[in-house]
Amino acid sequence: MALFIFLGIWLSCFLFLFLWNQHRGRGKLPPGPTPLPIVGNILQVDVKNISKSMGMLAKKYGPVFTVYLGMKPTVVLHGYKAMKEALIDQGDEFSDKTDSSLLSRTSQGLGIVFSNGETWKQTRRFSLMVLRSMGMGKKTIEDRIQEEILYMLDALRKTNGSPCDPSFLLACVPCNVISTVIFQHRFDYNDQTFQDFMENFHRKIEILASPWSQLCSAYPILYYLPGIHNRFLKDVTQQKKFILEEINRHQKSLDLSNPQDFIDYFLIKMEKEKHNQKSEFTMDNLVVSIGDLFGAGTETTSSTVKYGLLLLLKYPEVTAKIQEEIAHVIGRHRRPTMQDRNHMPYTDAVLHEIQRYIDFVPIPSPRKTTQDVEFRGYHIPKGTSVMACLTSVLNDDKEFPNPEKFDPGHFLDEKGNFKKSDYFVAFSAGRRACIGEGLARMEMFLILTNILQHFTLKPLVKPEDIDTKPVQTGLLHVPPPFELCFIPV
């Protein structure tokens, strides 16, 4: 009996201290639902569709509110104005990344995506410098993309118009493009090592998009229990092994005066700073940075184009207009180039609408404040997690009337010219916007226009029967599996 009394008193004290602490915190943080001990507000959040849950809470608490995903507060930014004020106007104060997600834990504070402070500044600055020197954003990188697209077109022709899943081939293009930048060589599509790497990469994305991954981020203790996160950790180990083998080959042939790719540049930087014990340029940082570049340069492009093909099957009238514009601007025999995009407003609008509509990353990995922040009259302590709902911006019904409808007109003016929108935040915003945005834009345009120049897309079912809803709606909106026929024209 005494034990039960003791436990009852202990639990009562715990609840009192928890609620008192939350009350104190609520005096500083934005408003939000009252959290329960330990579980916080997780029972009010659908981990299969977090953005929808946040939208419902925003209707009650406003565009800036606080939720507890577990025992720690997260400030949520909902809508364009709140996101712009935080991530752009006060970008320096909201520029760190949290370390609770599955991917951030395996990065160990290194690389380009999940590092913070001086590590992030130096690694990102160096990586951008190297990428630019290797032709990123210039004709040089466009030539690499064009070369890889030829391999893709050849592989599509070999399907002979029979039904096929386009996932692998669409992923090969951006993966091989970034491979030439990092490793100085591409992989044959039949290379088993390459296929294993691609399968490994795709499986990691599926795990990251799963509800279990979201729960692990809220309750890190789950990382120590059985679950699919252990499969993720094995895949990360295999990926590191693959990358280290490439690095070892580079070390044997390295010419300090003539770097050929990203690894060479990084190894030379390591050599220059080998006597600096505080150098950010280490072997571990190189491995993680390469993984980050593959992530930034592959998944967004391949999934967006794949989802785009599904939407073009669903809306054949849109496909016909793109092909009409291709015929008018480019013709049948000249290859599309990036210069053509300025003369193809409808195609450009469709590409933007695909990204807006699919909302591939509805809520990017949370950031955290770099210092105590005064924001909209609230006090947000240093290290507080901050979540930006991109869905709320991409689906703003004032900027995009009928946002639930796929309509390229969202990015066209009354004269049919392409219309830019500040609300287009498919690559996030501020200092932590996707480093691969420029490359992804080039690849999407060139892949899609080349496919539609050379093939007619034939669905296996009637367009009205095609379901475009994502199969997963957690961290990522993953397109449903589908097949189609590529009929040569």
From Swiss-Prot:
Q: Catalysed reaction per UniProt? A: chenodeoxycholate + reduced [NADPH--hemoprotein reductase] + O2 = alpha-muricholate + oxidized [NADPH--hemoprotein reductase] + H2O + H(+); ursodeoxycholate + reduced [NADPH--hemoprotein reductase] + O2 = beta-muricholate + oxidized [NADPH--hemoprotein reductase] + H2O + H(+)
GO CC, sorted alphabetically, is:
endoplasmic reticulum membrane
Quick check: keyword Membrane in the entry?
Answer: yes
Signal peptide bounds: 1-27
Expressed in which tissues:
Expressed in liver.
* The EC number(s) this enzyme carries: 1.14.14.-
UniProt xrefs under Gene3D superfamilies: Cytochrome P450
- Cytoplasm recorded as keyword: no
Describe its membrane topology.
Peripheral membrane protein
The record's annotation in InterPro entries points to: Cyt_P450, Cyt_P450_CS, Cyt_P450_E_grp-I, Cyt_P450_sf, Cytochrome_P450_fam2
Query: A Pfam family this protein belongs to?
Result: p450
Q: Which cofactor does it need?
A: heme
Q: What job does the chain carry out?
A: A cytochrome P450 monooxygenase involved in muricholic acid (MCA) synthesis. Hydroxylates at the 6-beta position two major bile acids, chenodeoxycholic acid (CDCA) and ursodeoxycholic acid (UDCA) to form alpha-MCA and beta-MCA, respectively. May regulate NR1H4/farnesoid X receptor signaling, as taurine-conjugated MCAs are antagonists of NR1H4. Mechanistically, uses molecular oxygen inserting one oxygen atom into a substrate, and reducing the second into a water molecule, with two electrons provided by NADPH via cytochrome P450 reductase (CPR; NADPH-ferrihemoprotein reductase).
Name the protein family.
Belongs to the cytochrome P450 family.
The name of this protein is Cytochrome P450 2C70
Species of provenance: Mus musculus (Mouse)
The gene from which this protein is expressed is Cyp2c70
